[in-house]
Curated annotation (Swiss-Prot):
This is Methylenetetrahydrofolate--tRNA-(uracil-5-)-methyltransferase TrmFO. Its EC number is 2.1.1.74. The gene is trmFO. The keyword DNA-binding does not apply. FAD binds at residues 10-15. Belongs to the MnmG family. TrmFO subfamily. Its cofactor is FAD. The keyword Metal-binding does not apply. It is found in: Cytoplasm.
Length: 444
């Protein structure tokens, strides 16, 4: 394949990472991004790597699978992780970022790279004669989605996910909330709105009866568990919320708390957490409260949360449809297409779920596209690593039941020998092995 550059289509997390990895290997890149010419319903800016759901990149500890994945990516020179570290905001044991600052930094690093040419245009055909990384994301334009659909054996895979509302911090009644991270992990980074049992029951009742925005009648409601609307959780039952986003464990009342409580209990019946959304600390999002309620209903129901009675919503929650491919049948473990060998795919459309996972897939696809360009053999990362196990999972899962997957220790190759019973100790060992295997892999 004679060519002088590689195409990357889409400048989200995966596309930005792929383009950067290719350029860092000395190969010119044409990076196509349609925003600026054509917008999507969910994106608010024309910046690259815009975060449309939460501003959290989740746990940072190596005993957390996504924490391990991030450490592997750091060692591989990820531009997404570098930008995230530079724009992080307080979030306890998690890595959360200033939403706008993060995407602005990624944009600047990519746009200013001497080997990356940014083309603001919509691509409607899949190239056949140029090595191309397709990373158009779950919000792929209709024209290109049709071409991918044809590659996808005509099967339409999709699910819905949603974003949580964002609130002006100056409109939160601080006398009714308290600052704390769960189990006092890291710095006190979350505002916590405690509820008594009666307050929770009233809130739950209002939530399950609130009016949702309509879906297209021909589409079934299929949600990804990690980004499920709060009203859908509520309809599954009270325990789903109390063991999920409103879990009170580790969020005891502070000693100076004077608000309502159930008797002498030290822990609230339920807690709503709010997380800082920007570096200035002027915006907070309601953690785990992705929603598809009508905007008026969001205001009515969420203002029942203690401290949010007069809250001003800077952005209401929204829901969008995400599409993904039949990766077990269509992709190699290198993220290369089995059907059209000049193509690589990356990001959520491949069935990896989550910001970090999307960027990781872009990193691997970019490395392998660069290797193909140089006529070198592509690389498959070890299944003992988080980055390798994710690629293995999406390309080896049962196609009939394939659904998007977050990175987790369950998909990473088991440790040899007798199973370590203590979960933390087991995860530490898995992480230790992963980083050692990655180091060895990179030196071969």
């Amino acid at each position: 394949m004679s060519q002088s550059y590689i195409n990357v289509i889409g400048a989200g997390l995966a596309g930005s990472e792929a383009a950067y990895q290719i350029a860092e290997r000395g190969i010119p890149v044409k990076l196509y991004e349609m925003r600026g010419v054509k917008s999507t319903p969910q994106h608010k800016t024309d910046n690259f790597a815009e975060l449309v759901c939460s501003n959290s990149l989740r746990g940072d500890a190596l005993t957390n699978a996504v924490g391990l994945l991030k450490e592997e990516m750091r060692r591989l020179g990820s531009v997404i992780l570098e930008s995230a570290e530079a724009t992080r905001v307080p979030a306890g044991g998690a890595l959360a970022v200033d939403r706008d600052g993060f995407s602005q930094m990624v944009t600047e690093k990519v746009v200013n790279h001497p080997l990356i040419e940014v083309v603001r245009d919509e691509i409607t055909e899949l190239p056949t004669d140029v090595i191309t990384v397709v990373a158009t994301g779950p919000l792929t334009s209709d024209a290109l989605a049709e071409k991918i659909h044809a590659l996808n054996n005509g099967d339409g895979f999709y699910f819905y996910d949603a974003a949580a509302p964002i609130i002006d911090v100056n409109t939160i009644d601080m006398s009714k909330v308290y600052l704390k991270s769960r189990y006092d992990k890291g710095e006190a980074a979350y505002l916590n709105a405690p509820m008594t049992k009666q307050e929770f029951m009233d809130f739950h009742e209002a939530l399950v009866n609130a009016e949702e925005a309509p879906l297209n009648s021909f589409e079934k409601e299929k949600y990804f568990e990690g980004c499920m609307p709060i009203e859908v959780m509520a309809k599954r039952g009270i325990k789903t919320m109390l063991y999920g986003p409103m879990k009170p464990v580790g969020l005891e009342y502070p000693d100076d708390y004077t608000g309502p409580r159930d008797g002498e209990f030290k822990t609230p019946y339920a807690v709503v957490q709010l997380r800082q959304d920007n570096a200035a600390g002027s915006l907070y999002n309601i953690v785990g409260f992705q929603t598809h309620l009508k905007w008026g209903e969001q205001k009515r129901v969420f203002q029942m949360i203690p401290g949010l009675e007069n809250a001003e919503f800077v952005r209401y929650g929204v829901m969008h449809r995400n599409s993904y491919m039949d990766s077990p049948n269509l992709l190699e473990q290198t993220y290369r297409s089995k059907k059209q060998p000049n193509l690589f795919f990356a990001g959520q459309m491949t069935g990896v779920e989550g910001y970090v996972e999307s960027a990781a897939s872009g990193l691997v696809a970019g490395i392998n596209a660069a290797r193909l360009f140089k006529e070198e053999s592509e690389v498959i990362f070890p299944e003992t690593t988080a980055i390798g196990s994710l690629a293995h999972y999406i390309t080896h899962a049962d196609s009939k039941h394939f659904q998007p997957m977050n990175v987790n220790f369950g998909i990473i190759k088991e440790l040899e020998g007798e199973r370590i019973r203590d979960k933390k100790a087991r995860y530490e060992k898995i992480a230790e092995r992963a980083l050692a295997d990655l180091e060895e892999f990179l030196t071969v």
